[in-house]
A protein has these predicted regions:
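Generic protein-terminus/edge-of-domain signal
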Residues: 1-61, 67
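A hydrophobic/aromatic-rich effector-binding and dimerization subdomain
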Residues: 2-12, 67-135
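Residues in well-ordered beta-strands of folded domains
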Residues: 18, 37, 72, 92, ...
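Residue-level signal for functionally critical sites in structured catalytic/ligand-binding pockets
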Residues: 29-31, 35, 44-47, 69-71, ...
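Basic, amphipathic alpha-helical hairpins
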Residues: 137-143
């Protein structure tokens, strides 16, 4: 199966976008932006690169730049069972927001290593962090 190269087109010039997903319908895709995904409803399987991991409401995923990914909702995978459809909120940001020589700047070492690890996908299971991020996402204008 091919990977959809997704271009994020903005109505205005910005390096960061908040995108609500009332349901997960995109095929396996990738984009240059990093993506912080909050799973706000439902459960299913998340494919990031070559890895597969279950997700559920309250989970947070951080996906690296140009990493193929897909979210498959259990309601779609098992239509005969009574699963709630999945939904999420994504914050996508362009790599250009970081300094060009990020790895050489001591104050950015933690961020540099986090961005490197995001090439494999990072999962966070912190309910307090989820609630804080959800409130912050909702305060950002969409797109």
């Amino acid at each position: 199966m091919g990977i959809l190269e997704r271009k994020i087109i903005h109505e205005r010039t910005t390096l960061c976008s908040h995108i609500p997903y009332p349901q997960f319908v995109l095929p396996r895709h990738k984009h240059v932006e990093y993506e912080l995904m909050l799973f706000t409803r439902g459960s299913g399987k998340q494919f990031v690169g070559e890895g597969v991991l279950d997700y559920q409401q309250g989970d947070i995923a951080f996906i690296g730049s140009n990493v193929p990914h897909l979210h498959l909702c259990n309601a779609k995978l098992n239509p005969t069972m009574d699963f709630e459809p999945s939904a999420g909120e994504a914050l996508q940001f362009h790599p250009m927001i970081f300094p060009f020589n990020l790895e050489e700047i001591p104050d950015y070492q933690f961020i540099y290593h986090l961005l490197q690890k995001s090439q494999y996908g990072i999962r966070f299971y912190d309910k307090e962090l989820f609630e804080e991020l959800k409130q912050r996402f909702l305060s950002i204008n969409v797109y």
